[in-house]
C-alpha cells in the first residue's frame, strides 16, 4: 500500500505543542486526541458505503451507512491515548487491545495480551500507536490482527521515521500507514528525532 503524511496546518500546530518538553501531560493528551480526531477524516476517506432506505420528516429516501463495523486496536499502553479523539467521531467503533513489550537483551517484541472483538474478521481495523520507530511493534501487532482473519488493516501513528516505515511496508505491503509527521531519524538508542520523547510517559505522567 502506501505511507501518507497528513500535512494540515492544525495538525502541525498541535504537534509542535506536543513536542515541547515543558508541555504538561494534560495538554499533551488533549493535543494528541485532537490530532487523532483530525486524522480520522483522511484515514476513513475510502470507506465503502451501503445504501439503505430512510424516512425523513417529509418522505422516504435513500441514505447511506458504512458497510462494515470499525474496530480500533491500540497498542498498549500509549495507543490508548489516541482512542478518545477517534471515538468522538465514530462512537460506535469497537475496541480490541494488543499488549507488547520489548526484551531489553534480545530486542525482540513479545505479546503479553491480546483481546479481539466479535466478528473482527469482517471489520475495518485501525491499529493505533503514537510512535513508529523501528517497526517491530507495528509488525507484531499487524501479525496478530492478521491472525484474527482481518483483511482490511490500517496503521495510524503520530510520528513515523525510517527504517520503521519501510520495514512495515516491506513485510505488510497490503497495510496503509498514516502519520501526522515523518520525522528525521532514529538516534543510536532508538529514539525518534526530533520526536516527542516517551509518548506513554508523557500521556500518563509517568517516568
From Swiss-Prot:
Residues the record lists as binding 5-phospho-alpha-D-ribose 1-diphosphate: 77, 102, 129-137, 198
Binding positions for uracil per the UniProt entry: 192, 197-199
Reactions performed catalytically: UMP + diphosphate = 5-phospho-alpha-D-ribose 1-diphosphate + uracil
InterPro entries linked: PRibTrfase_dom, PRTase-like, Upp_B, UPRTase/APRTase, Ura_phspho_trans
Activity regulation, per record: Allosterically activated by GTP.
Its EC number(s): 2.4.2.9
Necessary cofactors: Mg(2+)
Similarity comment: family membership: Belongs to the UPRTase family.
Protein name according to UniProt: Uracil phosphoribosyltransferase
Organism classification: Bacteria, Bacillati, Mycoplasmatota, Mollicutes, Entomoplasmatales
Gene name, Swiss-Prot/TrEMBL: upp
